[in-house]
């Protein structure tokens, strides 16, 4: 009989793999060994030097439950600032210490342990379980989960539903399930005027004035009032610069960067179109030209409340005694890629210490998460 790994101990072992993006650090090798010993078919899916792991138990094409997570971590900073070395996986007084303890080697370990326990039971379940684990979530994200999903599609692999194991709970285990995320886009806006002497503004065209007018229009009123499942969209000016050290010179150019986190009342295209139209109107009046470039991290998405959401929420409620809030708050995650393939939710640990010096997680919380994942699998395939 295949032994079921202790998810807390597996978390500590994964932490000892120094997998700072883009280095794999041995974490995916360890995970493949653990899953392979339990009968999972494992494939390394590396693209452009980015390491990823696909693992499936059960027949291709069967009803399939998926899990998406990452083993890469952010840099630890100065190791001397840590109580215990950041890649020690130190275990003491019920805590596991190290970079990735919260985000999110613990989530990966919890699901791996839950899945191994589930698929090795007697009789074996009727269905398939997939783990799609990337080494590029904390970095650019272009060749991580995207590459896994492309690889799966090319080979006829699919997931019918998926959980992303990001730390979803703000303060207490079981208080929140992410059923969607806002979209995110960044716009670089450059205003081109005519340089001149500050004493003779009629001989110049001040790009700062035109740019400030555009920024005022964009920030003077909210983009919306929110929707049924989303808070109001937010637009933030994150950079304003003209690179001009002289107080008596009107600069030729001025630049701003804005970031928009938008709900399902908008698309990136509709927001981009609105901003360009406002810039064009100001340009026509001021004769200052605008050049705008747009980078879209992801569109907003929602997994509407229904059978899958109800199943996960019911298990969380039974295990924790809390009625989880169905939320779309926070930043982006790799769920923005998965949502194009199947319904996706995010549920994981409490995110108190993620990305901090002395990142750590209670060992019992990791074991509780594994129990929740195991019960979700059992309920899904019942």
Swiss-Prot record:
Which terms does the UniProt entry file under GO BP? diaminopimelate biosynthetic process; L-arginine biosynthetic process; lysine biosynthetic process via diaminopimelate
Positions contributing to Zn(2+) 2 binding: 103, 138, 355
Q: Known catalysed reaction(s)? A: N-succinyl-(2S,6S)-2,6-diaminopimelate + H2O = (2S,6S)-2,6-diaminopimelate + succinate
Keyword annotations of the record: Amino-acid biosynthesis, Cobalt, Diaminopimelate biosynthesis, Hydrolase, Lysine biosynthesis, Metal-binding, Zinc
Q: Which GO molecular function annotation, any one, does this entry have?
A: succinyl-diaminopimelate desuccinylase activity
So, what pathway does this thing act in? Answer: Amino-acid biosynthesis; L-lysine biosynthesis via DAP pathway; LL-2,6-diaminopimelate from (S)-tetrahydrodipicolinate (succinylase route): step 3/3
The free-text cofactor remark is:
Binds 2 Zn(2+) or Co(2+) ions per subunit.
Q: How does it assemble?
A: Homodimer.
Needed co-factor(s): Zn(2+); Co(2+)
Q: What class of enzyme is it?
A: hydrolase
Q: Which residues form the active site?
A: 72, 137 (proton acceptor)
Which HAMAP family does UniProt cross-reference here?
Answer: DapE (MF_01690)
**What EC number(s) are associated with this protein in UniProt?**
3.5.1.18
What family name appears in the similarity comment? Belongs to the peptidase M20A family. DapE subfamily.
What is this protein's name? Answer: Succinyl-diaminopimelate desuccinylase
Binding of Zn(2+) 1, residues: 70, 103, 166
Q: What is the documented function of this protein?
A: Catalyzes the hydrolysis of N-succinyl-L,L-diaminopimelic acid (SDAP), forming succinate and LL-2,6-diaminopimelate (DAP), an intermediate involved in the bacterial biosynthesis of lysine and meso-diaminopimelic acid, an essential component of bacterial cell walls.
**Organism annotation:** Paracoccus denitrificans (strain Pd 1222)
């Amino acid at each position: 009989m295949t032994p079921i790994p202790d998810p807390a101990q597996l978390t500590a072992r994964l932490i000892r793999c120094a997998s700072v993006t883009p280095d794999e650090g041995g974490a995916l090798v360890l995970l493949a060994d653990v899953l392979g010993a339990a009968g999972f078919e494992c494939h390394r899916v590396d693209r452009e030097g980015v390491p990823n792991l696909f693992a499936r138990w059960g027949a291709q094409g069967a009803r399939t439950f998926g899990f998406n997570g990452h083993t890469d971590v952010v840099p630890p900073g100065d190791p001397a600032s840590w109580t215990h070395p950041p890649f020690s996986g130190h275990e003491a007084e019920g805590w596991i210490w190290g970079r990735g303890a919260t985000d999110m080697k613990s989530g990966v370990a919890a699901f791996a342990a839950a899945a191994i326990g589930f698929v090795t039971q007697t009789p074996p379940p009727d269905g398939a379980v997939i783990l799609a684990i990337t080494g590029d979530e904390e970095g650019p994200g272009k060749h991580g989960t995207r590459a896994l999903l492309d690889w799966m599609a090319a080979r006829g692999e699919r997931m019918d539903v998926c959980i992303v194991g990001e730390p979803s709970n703000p303060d207490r285990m079981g208080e929140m399930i992410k059923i969607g995320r806002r979209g995110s886009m960044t716009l670089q806006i450059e205003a081109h005027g005519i340089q001149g002497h500050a004493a003779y503004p009629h001989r110049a065209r001040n790009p700062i004035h035109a740019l400030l007018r555009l920024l005022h229009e964009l920030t003077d009123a909210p983009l919306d009032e929110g929707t049924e499942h989303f808070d109001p969209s937010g637009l933030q000016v994150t950079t304003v610069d003209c690179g001009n050290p002289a107080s008596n010179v009107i600069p030729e150019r001025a630049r701003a960067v804005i970031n928009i986190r938008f709900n399902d009342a908008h698309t990136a295209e509709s927001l981009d179109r609105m901003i360009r139209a406002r810039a064009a109107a100001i340009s026509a009046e001021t004769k200052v030209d605008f050049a705008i470039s747009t980078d879209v991290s992801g569109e907003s998405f929602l997994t509407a409340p229904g059978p899958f959401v109800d199943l996960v929420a019911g298990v969380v409620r039974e295990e924790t005694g809390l009625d989880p809030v169905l939320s779309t708050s926070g930043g982006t995650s790799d769920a923005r890629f998965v949502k194009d393939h199947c319904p996706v939710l995010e549920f994981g640990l409490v995110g108190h210490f993620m990305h901090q010096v002395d990142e750590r997680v209670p060992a019992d919380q990791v074991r509780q998460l594994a129990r929740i994942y195991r019960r979700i699998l059992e309920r899904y395939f019942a």
